[in-house]
Amino acid sequence: MKSSSFYHGLLFFFSMAISSMALAQQDSTARLGLPGDNLNLAAVLDVFRQSPTLESFESALNADTSKINNLDLNNDGKVDYIKVVDRPEENIHTIVLQVDLNEKETQDVAVIFVQKEGDNVKIQMIGDEDLYGKNYILEPAEATTATETTN
């Protein structure tokens, strides 16, 4: 009987471990029921990391072929163009992704912080609270894809 309970315990442990791994690897395209559902920030961060310049990043982000951007924040039935605005200050670049709602108003979509510390570069993206909810933060993993922390 001892070995039977040992195997049951082992089976329970492995099933719990597999369940938690499955939860940890949830699809990064999970819908939040917010306007930001039409722009996958994990995909945006991957495009950012692959782009040699901010201009090429903006072009890739808005290319019809990329299928990343499907935002329509001004409800005109057209996909909004996302502007990339860089605000450098010392060793930190604050890169703001914005959409023009009309001629006078813009809506920030997300902010990418890039900080250089010696030979290391830290990148963090924060989705706008109105579009993604509170504390929607992404940081690139050591691999080539981004990890995200949602609400």
Where is each model-derived feature located?
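N-terminal low-complexity segments enriched in Gly/Pro/Tyr/Ser
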Residues: Q25-N151
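Bacterial Sec-dependent N-terminal signal peptides
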Residues: M1-D27
